């Protein structure tokens, strides 16, 4: 499968892709456009941002079956989502964004999440620990999204710099765990797709390539080839 990663999934549509909308939090976090203008910058080897999940809040979202909804576990209140979302909604839990305060989601919370949404994917940090990967596999999660942006003092970096780190992570997870891997980070060319596929990715998440939409067709064609 091919995913359009947030924030692009909120606006971009493509017939061959699944939109991932969000990332949403239990409480409203205003200022998306302003934060994009203030922090989104082209840097050497990628893009840097410190958007920090600016969104209208879960209560103000109209959920649809044709999208996946990225939900952030920012604090212990995130469990409120169980009272707000139908079990038929497709979700991804984001536990590794560098632009917000960290919260260590617990094993009981992960068990509850998997019980309610067995097909939920988990998006993790590029610095995810073996212990956390062990917990995810033991709980029973099938899909893992590798990965969030690389943390820096000024925000998270995506693009080629992330790909270099992420390829190592995809290889490690593929060789040591039983997840279906969603790979994202620095996918701009057919070669990037092949690199991730050879490392063990089964699905692909497209993000800043949407800044250069003329690249997208060849990337998607290559994903279809490696997915046969």
Q: Where do the model's predicted regions map?
A:
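Glycine-rich phosphate-binding active-site loops on the catalytic face of alpha/beta enzymes
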Residues: 22-29, 91-97, 143-153, 187, ...
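Hydrophobic faces of well-ordered beta-strands that scaffold small-molecule active sites
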Residues: 2-6, 17-22, 67-71, 89-93, ...
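N-terminal capping/small domains of soluble enzymes
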Residues: 1-76
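Hydrophobic alpha-helical segments and helix pairs
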Residues: 81-110
């Amino acid at each position: 499968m091919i995913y359009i990663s947030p924030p692009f999934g909120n606006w971009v549509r493509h017939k061959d892709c699944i939109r991932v909308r969000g990332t949403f939090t239990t409480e409203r976090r205003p200022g998306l456009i302003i934060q994009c203008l203030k922090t989104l910058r082209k840097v050497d080897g990628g893009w840097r941002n410190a958007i920090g999940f600016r969104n209208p809040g879960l209560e103000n979202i109209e959920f649809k079956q044709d999208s996946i909804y990225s939900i952030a576990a920012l604090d212990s209140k995130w469990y409120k989502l169980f009272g707000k979302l139908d079990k038929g909604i497709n979700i991804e839990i984001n536990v590794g964004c560098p632009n917000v305060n960290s919260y260590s989601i617990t094993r009981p919370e992960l068990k509850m999440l998997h019980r309610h949404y067995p097909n939920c994917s988990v998006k993790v940090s590029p610095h995810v620990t073996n212990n956390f990967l062990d917990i995810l596999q033991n709980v029973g999660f099938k899909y893992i999204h590798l990965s969030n942006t690389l943390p820096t003092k000024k925000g998270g970096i995506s693009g080629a710099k992330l790909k270099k780190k992420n390829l190592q992570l995809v290889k490690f997870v593929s060789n040591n765990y039983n997840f279906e891997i969603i790979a994202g980070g620095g996918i701009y060319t057919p070669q990037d797709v092949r690199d991730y596929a050879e490392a063990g990715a089964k699905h692909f998440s497209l993000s800043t390539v949407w800044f250069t939409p003329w690249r997208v067709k060849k990337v998607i064609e290559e994903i279809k080839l490696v997915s046969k």
